């Protein structure tokens, strides 16, 4: 499993650049310095537990703008300890040419709040799992192959194995990028969603 620490946010405040005509000559160099993350974002950009979202770089549109939608399905109403579930992440926005996502599963509250909850795994060659060496949280996210659309949507299927013991509710935080494929952070739309799954009642 690749290990990465949470990467830097965009080094250049792009909106401020465009407000200053004298700075326009710097735009080309600025964009070259901005990470595009076609092979997957740095860990820690789902928007959950105080994290930023992908808008840390793709910031010229508001979060969850009308016209797009990010959904997660396949999670149980209540999870059974140790059981494996298949989650489907779908991102839609008219006109997008590429798409990306990042998902984390963490305990929602209690003493373990924010800690890794269970295990994430890809189901195919369109996603990978990375590990944040600082927080010890894993993230499943797109890779280069996973940026290609399925029909008119970003579509990924991942596996989540529930914690071995029913420690508490699990929070899933997901961010998605509906991208225009212009190799810059401009013109992209970021969406987030979250869900909470409680453990099954003890028998």
What residue ranges belong to the model's regions?
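Sequence context surrounding c-type heme c attachment/ligation sites in exported
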Residues: 2, 31-161, 165-203
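N-terminal secretory signal peptides that target proteins for export/translocation
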Residues: 1-17
């Amino acid at each position: 499993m690749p290990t990465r620490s949470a990467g830097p946010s965009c080094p250049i405040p792009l909106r401020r650049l465009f407000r200053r005509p004298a700075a326009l000559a710097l735009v080309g160099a600025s964009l070259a310095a901005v990470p595009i993350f076609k092979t997957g974002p740095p860990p820690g950009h789902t928007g959950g537990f105080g994290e930023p979202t992908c808008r840390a770089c793709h910031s010229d549109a508001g979060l969850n703008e009308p016209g797009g939608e990010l959904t997660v399905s396949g999670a149980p109403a209540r999870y059974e300890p140790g059981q494996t579930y298949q989650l489907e992440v779908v991102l839609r926005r008219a006109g997008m040419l590429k798409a990306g996502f990042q998902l984390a599963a963490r305990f929602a509250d209690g003493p373990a709040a924010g800690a890794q909850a269970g295990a994430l795994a890809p189901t195919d060659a369109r996603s990978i799992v990375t590990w944040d060496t600082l927080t010890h949280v894993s993230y499943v996210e797109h890779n280069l192959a996973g940026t290609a659309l399925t029909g008119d949507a970003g579509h990924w299927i991942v596996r989540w194995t529930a914690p071995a013991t029913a420690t508490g509710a699990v929070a899933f935080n997901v961010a998605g990028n509906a991208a225009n494929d212009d190799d810059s952070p401009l013109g992209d739309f970021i969406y987030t969603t979250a869900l909470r799954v409680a453990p099954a009642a003890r028998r």
